[in-house]
């Protein structure tokens, strides 16, 4: 959000029309990996989540 605010502020300083920021739905990627590096033992798993946030800002 801070980056969007900085872009909008800079555009308004240059007297540009600004539309946005429009929030695009967050994309969530789930990654499942084995905890054991050697592959032996009990099957235990780690779940990691990667979130991608996107914004669209139109400068006219």
Swiss-Prot record:
Keyword Nucleotide-binding: no
Gene3D superfamilies: Ribosomal protein S10 domain
GO biological process, one term: translation
UniProt GO molecular function: structural constituent of ribosome
Database matches in SUPFAM superfamilies: Ribosomal protein S10
Keywords tagged on the record: Ribonucleoprotein, Ribosomal protein
Domain of life the protein comes from: Eukaryota
Keyword Ribosomal protein found: yes
Membrane-spanning intervals of the chain: none
Pfam families assigned to the protein according to its UniProt record, in alphabetical order: Ribosomal_S10
GO cellular component, one term: cytosolic small ribosomal subunit
Family membership noted in the UniProt record: Belongs to the universal ribosomal protein uS10 family.
Protein name, per record: Small ribosomal subunit protein uS10
Species this protein is from: Zea mays
Taxonomic lineage: Eukaryota, Viridiplantae, Streptophyta, Embryophyta, Tracheophyta
Gene that this polypeptide is encoded by: RPS20
């Amino acid at each position: 959000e801070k980056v969007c605010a900085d872009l909008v502020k800079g555009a308004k300083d240059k007297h540009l029309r600004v539309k946005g920021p429009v929030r695009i739905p967050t994309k969530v990627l789930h990654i499942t990996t084995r905890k054991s590096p050697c592959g032996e033992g009990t099957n235990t798993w780690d779940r990691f989540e990667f979130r991608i946030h996107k914004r669209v800002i139109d400068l006219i």
